[in-house]
Amino acid sequence: MLNRFLDGIARRTCLAIGAAAVLWATPAAALSYRLVDADFPNCKGECPKVIVASGTISQNEHLQLFAFLEQSLGHGKVAQILVIESPGGFTAGGLALGYALRKLKMSVIVGRWTGESLTGKSGLTSGTCASACVFALAGGTSRYFVTGSRVGVHRAHTGTAVLDPTTRLPVNATVDHESGHAFFRQFFRTMGVDNGVVEKLAATQSESMYWFSPDEMSRYRLARDSSARPTGERKRR
């Protein structure tokens, strides 16, 4: 069952966008996952752990997530929440991760872990979710950002002498923008996100970044401020 699901993700992303499996940001430090203790008011002393991820997105990021979830078995209850901070990575990796998160019915929060236990008032500060990370964010059944976080998009890289606007590392890739944008529209529509996100993406050169305002994120149904989020969401058993 899992193999069929993973095969479906790979086929859905790679066949649809072809060369868009290329980078939107050259991976520097791979996305890493960890379980973080939580202490929310409505589950005092019995709160499930929360998954926190930071780094750049690999081409097969959904496989990394599933491997982490398997390793987490036996480590107590885990909430269906992913806190993410990422400058981007492989486009197809972000798309596949988004599909996987939706399949797992996980909520996604953009933010940076401070090293403390997560409570309703501490443990997270503002973070960044850019480029390919936005596809992962869109996959969340509920989507939030910590106040002050930055969420941004741009066109995929083309040509040879291009620096990613977030990582400032060189990228060498060629993308069929027309077919890629058509697939992105389908993806965001499936996830319940307004196509205004793709319009901003298509209009922003690869060496720049369009950062959404909080109002735009709400209007495009991309994410809401986490201050409006109820604590202690569903947990995985």
Enumerate the language-model features and the residues they cover.
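Bacterial N-terminal signal peptides that target proteins for export
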Residues: 2-15
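Cleft-lining beta-strand/loop regions that shape enzyme active-site pockets
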Residues: 33-149, 153-155
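N-terminal signal peptide c-region/cleavage motif recognized by signal peptidases
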Residues: 25-27
